[in-house]
């Protein structure tokens, strides 16, 4: 589940990112 995050996190700050992938993960974490 976090496999893509390793490479994606390089150029995408997870907390401040608004891309679809991060938004989906943030929503899942809230639940």
Swiss-Prot record:
Protein location: Nucleus
- Give GO terms: molecular function aspect only: metal ion binding; sequence-specific DNA binding
As for family, the record states:
Belongs to the DMRT family.
From which organism does this entry originate?
Danio rerio
| Chief localization | nucleus
> What is the annotated role of this protein in its UniProt record?
May regulate transcription.
Which residue ranges hold the DNA-binding region?
1-31
State the source organism's domain of life.
Answer: Eukaryota
UniProt xrefs under PANTHER family? DOUBLESEX AND MAB-3 RELATED TRANSCRIPTION FACTOR DMRT, DOUBLESEX- AND MAB-3-RELATED TRANSCRIPTION FACTOR 3
> What's in the keyword line of the UniProt record?
DNA-binding, Metal-binding, Nucleus, Transcription, Transcription regulation, Zinc
Q: What lineage is on file? A: Eukaryota, Metazoa, Chordata, Craniata, Vertebrata
PROSITE patterns, sorted = DM_2 (PS50809)
What protein name applies here? Doublesex- and mab-3-related transcription factor 3b
GO CC annotation terms, alphabetical? nucleus
Per the UniProt record, one Pfam family is DM
What does the entry give for GO biological process?
Answer: regulation of DNA-templated transcription
């Amino acid at each position: 589940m976090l496999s893509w995050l390793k490479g994606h996190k390089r150029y995408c700050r997870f907390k401040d990112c608004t891309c679809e992938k991060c938004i989906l993960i943030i929503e899942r974490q809230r639940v």
